[in-house]
Regions:
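Glycine- and acidic
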Residues: 67-71, 168-176, 216-218
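N-terminal accessory targeting/assembly segments
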Residues: 1-132
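Short alpha-helical segments and helix-capping/turn motifs at coil-helix boundaries
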Residues: 79-88, 129-132, 158, 312-325
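Charged, amphipathic alpha-helical linker segments immediately N-terminal to NTP-binding catalytic cores
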Residues: 137-197, 202
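Conserved glycine(s) of the Walker
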Residues: 227-230
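Glycine-rich, often acidic-flanked micro-motifs
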Residues: 1-55, 196, 204-224, 234-240, ...
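Extended, Lys/Arg-enriched charged tracts that mediate electrostatic binding to polyanionic substrates
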Residues: 106-150, 301-311
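Catalytic cores of large soluble enzymes that bind and process phosphate-bearing ligands
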Residues: 70-78, 175-183, 327
């Protein structure tokens, strides 16, 4: 006996679909995973097989490869074959469904969905924190969907791993990666296209508001990975408030739309002394950790890189204790370009 779940571009059958469980239930499921450990802070730390996004295993489904120059592609026929392979696998699995919105502005919130094996409930819990959940209807119709099977190999692809992207139908199928970044990126990649179609510019940027004598000013913060984008976004000088950590839409006229109700933060070298806000959010019971070194007594060593420097944590914005709702942020006043590393040439030199 199977259950059925239908979406705009898929019909799935599974042994069960657990739809929109609570955070408490998701955390409990994550703690049952064999590669999960509880920490002394009351949250969960999962060690994954894959510790970063798999760009070499990412392919766009198209019959016009020239239209996607610079990107690896697969044919529509091959995408359908992969879909059939994944659908057959799901038929024997217990799945979790997480519904929500990318963004929270009534004019620009995009209905989104993650469908993933219950065996990897930490990813479901992490995505649930990042989606905006207010006002999700019972008949939720996602514009973007990620169907995620971390335990299904994709034979013949790099590392037997595949992220198959169907831009036309807002659908991403992920096979054989247990890294949360594929869930996050799967939705945001589709959202980027929606922003462009609406005349905006999607930006990999933080956003914060800073009080001044002339009123609050809105800053966008851009920089390559490792230059301090998250750190700069969450610093509290002058009572500034973070709006968004990772992706925003910049619209004509300077209006900013946010994407996520939380943060997927790097934890390597995280210091309570120098980054107290992020440290506090990471070390509280509702956060999820990924690939962070953990001592035998359940404490965390953010400076230990014996497994990876790409340790991560997901936490909700409310864990910060203070933030600015993107709907209330003004139009953009300043753009900050970070170039902390000596080997990085800034995008704008003068």
């Amino acid at each position: 006996m199977t259950q059925k779940l239908e979406g705009p571009a898929y019909v799935l059958e599974a042994r069960s679909f657990l739809q929109n469980p609570s955070q408490d239930d998701l955390m409990a499921l994550a703690l049952k995973m064999p590669n999960a450990k509880p920490t002394k802070y009351g949250n969960v730390n999962v060690t994954t097989r894959v510790d970063s996004r798999s760009s070499k295993s990412t392919f766009i489904a198209t019959d016009d490869p020239a239209a996607h120059e610079g990107h690896a592609t697969i044919s529509r026929e091959e995408f359908s074959r992969i879909a059939g392979l994944q659908d057959d696998f799901i038929r024997d699995q217990d799945m979790v469904v997480i519904d929500g919105f990318i963004g929270n502005d009534p004019e620009f919130k995009v209905p989104a969905r993650l469908i993933i094996e219950q065996a990897n409930a930490n990813i479901a819990g992490m995505q649930d924190l990042l989606y905006f959940k207010e006002g999700v209807p019972a008949d939720h119709q996602p514009a973007v969907t990620v169907i995620y099977t971390p335990n299904l190999p994709a034979a013949g692809y790099p590392n037997d791993r595949l992220i198959a992207v169907d831009l036309d139908n807002g659908l991403t199928r992920v096979l054989n990666s247990d890294y949360f970044g594929e869930s996050k990126k799967g939705g945001l990649r589709m959202w980027n296209r929606i922003v462009v179609d609406r005349g905006g510019l999607p930006m990999h940027a933080g956003c914060k508001t800073v009080p001044t004598e002339e009123g609050d000013k809105t800053f966008l913060i851009v920089g390559l990975s490792g230059t301090g984008k998250t750190t700069t976004t969450f610093t509290r000088q002058n009572d500034s408030k973070p709006v968004q950590d990772d992706f925003i839409a910049l619209m004509p006229g300077g209006k900013v739309h946010g994407t996520e109700n939380g943060c997927f933060a790097k934890t390597f070298a995280l210091s309570k002394e120098y980054e107290p806000t992020i440290y506090g959010a990471v070390t509280q019971p509702k956060s999820y950790l990924e690939n962070v070194f953990q001592t035998e007594d359940g404490d965390l060593d953010f400076f230990n890189e014996s497994f990876t420097q790409n340790g991560r944590a997901v936490f909700g914005m409310e864990a910060l204790g203070w933030f600015q709702d993107a709907r209330e942020a003004g139009t953009v006043d300043y753009l900050l370009i970070l170039n902390r590393n000596n080997n990085i040439i800034p995008a704008v030199a003068r």
